[in-house]
Structures are given as structure tokens and as C-alpha cells.
Amino acid sequence: SISEKIRCNAKVNDNLLRQAQALYKNRFIDLKPFNGKMPPDWQLGTVSEIIELHDSKRIPLSSRERANLTKIYPYYGATSVMDYVDRYLFDGIYLLLGEDGTVVDDKGFPILQYVEGKFWVNNHAHIITGKNGFTVETLYLLFSLTNVRSIVTGAVQPKISQANLNNVSVVIPSKVELSTFNSIVQPIFSQIRNLRAESDRLTSTRDILLPRLMSGEIDAANIQL
């Protein structure tokens, strides 16, 4: 069924992501290819040296403002798609990292969204791309394996500020090493994006067909997917 295929795609993507995380951990955290020692052309630095923040382009829209908009492009909040709107602020592949509200999981790792295409973001998520050899995909893996509980402020409304995020210590591999790693993980993330796009199409198809199937307007036996 359509629902089973969507679930299968999600399971495959989870497995692909775990594979990519294992590759990152082996190479850049455990340093297994380098006998556990950081190569001399790598350096210790901070997140500010490897990310570009696009937070200044964010524009929050109230639920009232969104109510009459045609539902075309995803409208992201700190943790997920909150709504759909008829315009977009960004177009491309970006990493969203929760800024306030729910910003870490129960183990202290940041709430991340790997997004692509045309979309809008409210002011509750940091919008990130990479620099100095770091791609969005490599940043996703880095942050998914970095506990950030210590930089969260605010008891009532948890927050990860730009300043605290930028000051997180990181290992910065050489650009050659980053390029080599990127060539390995890009096909994995390409497959993740393709499966996610397929699931989105299947979800749209299901949402269109289901009411017509339930009403008897169309016969399930005549459907070809």
C-alpha cells in the first residue's frame, strides 16, 4: 500500500542517516583512519568558522496571516513543518537548528531539519549553510553527533543563541579531507532526498485518492502506482 511504501522509505532513510553518522564518527571523532591522532593540518576551532547564518532573512507569519494563503511551500518552525504558504524566503539545501522552544532531544542533541527546495522559516530556527569546506550535509552530521545541552539557556523557554552556537568548539579537518568525505556522503544524502521526495508525492496521491475511494467514486482495483 501507499502507507507501507512511505513507512519503508522512512526506515531506509533512517538507516542511510545512521550509516553517514557512523562514517563521520569514525573519521572525525574517533579518528580511526589516523590512528586516533588529529592530523597536523587539522585544527581546533569554533562553529563560527564553519557556518553561515541566514537568520536575518527570517520573517515570522502569524496563524492569522497564514490562514488565507494558498498551501504551496512549507513553513518551518523550530522542529517541523508548521504550515504551508504561497511564497518562499529560501530556495536550496539548508540546515535548520532549533533556536527556541524545543531545541534539544532528551539526550541533549540539537533538533535538526535537513531541508531543500523552496520554503519559509519563522524566527524559531537558525538557518545554516556551510563554509571553509563544510557542506550542509557534513554540518548535519557534525551537529547530530554534538551534545549541546550546555549551551541551552532559559528555564521556561529554552534557547540556543547565535553567540552560544557560534562558540561551540569543533575539530576542523583540512579542506582536502572534507572534500574526500563529502564525495562519500553526498550520494547517501542524494538518496535520502530522492526517497523523501517520493514519499511526499505518495502522500499527496494518498490524500487526493482517499476521499474518492471512501466515497466509491473510484475503484481501488483500477489504481496504478
Each language-model region and where it sits:
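Non-catalytic DNA-recognition/assembly elements of restriction-modification systems
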Residues: 1-60, 65-77, 171, 175-221
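DNA target-recognition domains and sequence-specific DNA-contacting regions of bacterial/archaeal
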Residues: 39, 43-173, 224-225
